[in-house]
């Protein structure tokens, strides 16, 4: 077992096609945009420049995260490292909001309801019908999951509940060996992990935004608590600007 500090890197996928269209995405499996691919490559360059070279990758079952990780690792010359994938790192399931325009949803339901669905810790959107065109209930990649485990909607609390077992059972053991661990995932699965790491309250987590494509580096002590709360973005100025853009997503036309 290696001694602390343990090195953890979090990377939200680059801009996706539905990010660009301002649509709720959730479990819908969309591709990166050209901009998103460039963000991923730049993320790998930032890792290489900082000397933060991952030894193992953990990612979701969704192509936007998988592709981001591939591009970043290729850019950092680490494409050869072991890869572990889990549905537990998937984006939050947005229920009946999946495929809907964020600005139109805001206009239809009002800011209070919109923000409750989008940012509250424990209020999920209405469930998505299992025969809906944007449902993943019968997707073959989830065939081994019991039906009661496959979500029809989720709040952030649900994401934390399904993500934390993977943190403790799969990511922590890699950290304990001294590996530098890269987690390439999604806005909400990473928000849930940061909530756990930094001890953010259920109320305050609503204000946390994670930008696309900019690595967030943590050094963790022997109890897996951050030596620097909030970690360190490898491009702080770009992260600050991107976080403001994420905040304003619902306001786009």
From Swiss-Prot:
Enzyme class: isomerase
Family: Belongs to the phosphoglycerate mutase family. BPG-dependent PGAM subfamily.
EC number per UniProt: 5.4.2.11
Single GO BP term: glycolytic process
Protein name: 2,3-bisphosphoglycerate-dependent phosphoglycerate mutase
Catalytic residue positions: 13, 91
Biological role stated in the UniProt entry: Catalyzes the interconversion of 2-phosphoglycerate and 3-phosphoglycerate.
Keywords: Gluconeogenesis, Glycolysis, Isomerase
Reactions this protein catalyses: (2R)-2-phosphoglycerate = (2R)-3-phosphoglycerate
Species: Streptomyces griseus subsp. griseus (strain JCM 4626 / CBS 651.72 / NBRC 13350 / KCC S-0626 / ISP 5235)
Record's keyword annotation contains Manganese: no
Site feature: Transition state stabilizer: 186
HAMAP family with a match to the protein in the record: PGAM_GpmA
Pathway involvement of the protein, from the record: Carbohydrate degradation; glycolysis; pyruvate from D-glyceraldehyde 3-phosphate: step 3/5
Cross-referenced InterPro entries: His_Pase_superF_clade-1, His_PPase_superfam, PG/BPGM_mutase_AS, Phosphogly_mut1
Keyword Isomerase: yes
């Amino acid at each position: 077992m290696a001694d602390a500090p343990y090195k953890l890197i979090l990377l939200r996928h680059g801009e996706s096609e539905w990010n660009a269209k301002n649509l709720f995405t959730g479990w819908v499996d969309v591709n990166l945009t050209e901009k998103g691919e460039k963000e991923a490559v730049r993320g790998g360059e930032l890792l290489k420049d900082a000397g933060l070279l991952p030894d193992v990758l953990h990612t979701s079952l969704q192509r936007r995260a998988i592709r981001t990780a591939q591009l970043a690792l290729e850019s950092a010359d680490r494409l050869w490292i072991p890869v572990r994938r889990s549905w537990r790192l998937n984006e939050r399931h947005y229920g009946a909001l999946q495929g809907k325009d964020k600005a139109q949803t805001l206009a239809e339901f009002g800011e209070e309801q919109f923000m409750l669905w989008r940012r509250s810790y424990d209020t999920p959107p209405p469930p998505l019908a299992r025969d809906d065109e944007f449902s993943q209930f019968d997707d073959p990649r989830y065939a081994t999951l019991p039906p009661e485990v496959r979500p029809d909607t989720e709040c952030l609390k649900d994401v934390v509940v399904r993500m934390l077992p993977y943190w403790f059972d799969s990511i922590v053991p890699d950290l304990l060996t001294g590996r530098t661990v890269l987690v390439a995932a999604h806005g909400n699965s990473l928000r849930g992990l940061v909530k756990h790491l930094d001890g953010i309250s259920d109320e305050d987590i609503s204000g946390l935004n994670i930008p696309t494509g900019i690595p967030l580096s943590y050094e963790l002590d022997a109890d897996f608590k951050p030596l620097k709360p909030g970690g360190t973005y490898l491009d702080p100025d770009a992260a600050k600007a991107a976080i403001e853009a994420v905040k304003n997503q619902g306001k786009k036309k």
